[in-house]
Amino acid sequence: MFKTLDRYIIRQFLGTFFFILVTIMLIAVVFDISEKTEDFTKMKASTWVIIRDYYLNFIVYYSNLFSGLLIFLAVLLFTSRLAHRTEIIAMLSSGVSFPRIMWPYFLTATILTGLSLLINHAVLPSANKVRLAFEEEHIRATYHVNEKHLLREITPGSIAYFESFNTNENIGFRFSLENWSNGELTRKLTADRAQYDSVSGAWRVSDYLLRTMDGSREHIERGQMLDTIINLKPSDLGQRWESSMAMGWTELNAYIKAKLAQGDGSLMPFLIEKHQRTSYPFATYVFTLIGVSIASRKVRGGTGLHLALGVLLVLIYIFTMKLTSVAATNAGLDPLIAVWIPNVLFALVGIWIYQKAPK
């Protein structure tokens, strides 16, 4: 049964959190509108379509993205207010233990964690699919290719190579297509450039050289133009990592498996996205533990000092997240470990602060 204390803390927790969430989202929408005003005036989409397809899904995405940090600020704010009004001291003096005070906090954190997990795995992919489709239709390109020396295994034994690729013109430079059988090269097509025809789905190669090996014999063919159909699209060479956010769990796993089979080495953002969908919601428990442990102590600086400490910890947490993501991308750190390191480190910090909290 919920006691008056439990209902009071849960009401304060949720009320403060949703107030901060609504305020931050209103500010974010205003800033985004001011930034994209020129884009909106150029596009043919109606105001209703912009609101329905873009901003409603924009709010869903960023509300969930910042939920952990906003929960932390909410806990700091209302717990600091309770401490400033000596309500925490009154609870402890009346015989209520500090772990008992923590119970409604963690009950609320469990509700918010479950909600975030549900949104991450069931709601957000569909919302992001609509939002990103709107952005790609009206604001930005669907994909981009920044890498050099692109290598893709189209089918077993069939390998395509581009030295560089121009996404605006769908043209690849220094193109080659190799066919291997039993460890031996049987056919190799090289060309100065290859342009993709989106209508026919074929690649048109220019100034090509085709070598065909038949045992000890080699046939060479040169030409100015040749159309060849291969199971490769420009979007397979480079896709915005944000597209991973629009994929459901099954779709994301299938995409990762297919790209690994092609030898695509740019999958780390997709792997990080996959594991973060589960790891990030659990940061709610960590933020709640740290927030209560810091803000429950009545200090001379009051709420201002608690907020300053909270902002500092948030910045360190974000820095740790970025650091581990970079380590996963560039240093070979396992992405599953990388996304959980910030939670584990800050959980240890939270336990230490909790032990120092007044009881």
Question: Where are the predicted features?
Answer:
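Short solvent-exposed strand/turn elements
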Residues: 207-215
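N-terminal amphipathic/hydrophobic interface segments
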Residues: 191, 222-224
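Transmembrane alpha-helices
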Residues: 1-156, 167, 184, 214-216, ...
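An exposed, glycine/acidic-rich loop-and-rim segment of catalytic or binding clefts
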Residues: 219
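Short beta-strand/turn micro-motifs at beta-sheet edges
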Residues: 226-228
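Structural signature for solvent-exposed beta-strand/loop edge elements and short helix-capping sites
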Residues: 154-200, 205-208
